[in-house]
Structure formats: C-alpha cells, structure tokens
A protein has these predicted regions:
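Extended, compositionally simple hydrophobic/Ser/Thr-rich segments
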Residues: 2-111
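Intrinsically disordered, low-complexity terminal regions
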Residues: 1-9, 83-168
Length: 168
C-alpha cells in the first residue's frame, strides 16, 4: 500500500509481468514485456513500457495508466483513465473508462518500442474501443450511459520519467 515500485531496463527483458493486489501505488515498468496483467489494483498510477502482446486489467478501479501495447483488454474495471498506444482495445463489464493518446516518455523507450515490434509513429487505435457489452446495452429497456469515453486530444501532460528513480 502506498509504495513506489520501479522495474528498470533489464528487469523484465521481454517476459511477462504481473501487478496484483496493489493499493495507492505508483508503478513504473521501464522495460519491454511480452504480456502484462493487472489484477485487483485500486487507486494506482501505472506507466508500462511497450508490450509485445496483451495488457490485461481485471477487477480494478481508479487506475491512471499510461501504456503501449499490441492489445488492451479490460474486464470488470471502473473509474479508470488510460493513455494508450494500442493496435486494439476492448472492454467487458466495465464502467466509466476514459481513453486518451499515449503520453509516456523515458530513457530507452525507442529501443523498447522496437523490441516489442511496435511503431510509435504507426497506427494508434486507442480511440477504437470494442465494448463487448454494447449489444446488451442496446437491447436494454432503459437507455444506458456509455461505458467508455475519449479524453480530448492534448488533455494529458507528458508523463516523463527523468531517471529510473524519479518521475517528473
């Protein structure tokens, strides 16, 4: 609870990374990975370097996440704000999710994008979110508020990690 957790370059090395049962933490994953799972995390700020595969977040709330990944999947999450570079994004059983464009920066990031086979100048589809519950909502007797929204472009300041020990 309330910790600052930092995984530096070489700590993950393209392997999977799991964040679970965190409360009021700041997490910096300053490396590239194959897959990232966030389970049962609440009131956290998370910066995740490029992910070659999927970023999964489940049973979490009040997260502020900056991440670059091939695919994002959220399930049973609420009140989360994500700044993304993603080829695809999908949510299921989520509420009040806000998406914005990638805003992260740290030393070595370009090499991590290359290692994860992501092109930062390429297609960022953070704004094309598939909601698995949209059909159910459309069939409901009463109209339902959208489960997700987009943050205006440029609304987020750059989250730049000046060194592995401190975020600016």
């Amino acid at each position: 609870r309330g910790e600052r957790l930092v995984l530096r370059e070489g700590d993950v090395r393209g392997q999977s990374c799991e964040l679970s049962e965190l409360r009021e933490c700041t997490v910096l994953v300053l490396d590239w990975s194959a897959q990232v799972t966030i389970d049962d995390c609440h009131d956290c700020q998370v910066l995740i370097g490029p992910v070659d595969g999927s970023l999964f977040a489940r049973n979490s709330s009040k997260l502020r996440v900056t991440a670059a990944c091939r695919q994002l999947r959220l399930r049973d999450c609420a009140d989360c704000t994500l700044s993304l570079f993603a080829h695809s994004a999908a949510i299921e059983a989520c509420d009040r999710i806000v998406f914005g464009a990638w805003n992260g920066a740290y030393a070595g990031l370009s090499a991590h994008f290359a290692a994860a086979k992501l092109e930062p100048g390429g297609r960022n589809r953070y704004d094309r979110v598939h909601d698995f519950n949209a059909d159910d909502d459309a069939k409901a007797a009463a109209p339902r508020a959208p489960r997700w929204s987009l943050q205006p472009e440029g609304a987020w300041a750059l989250w730049e990690v000046a060194d592995a020990g401190a975020a600016v």
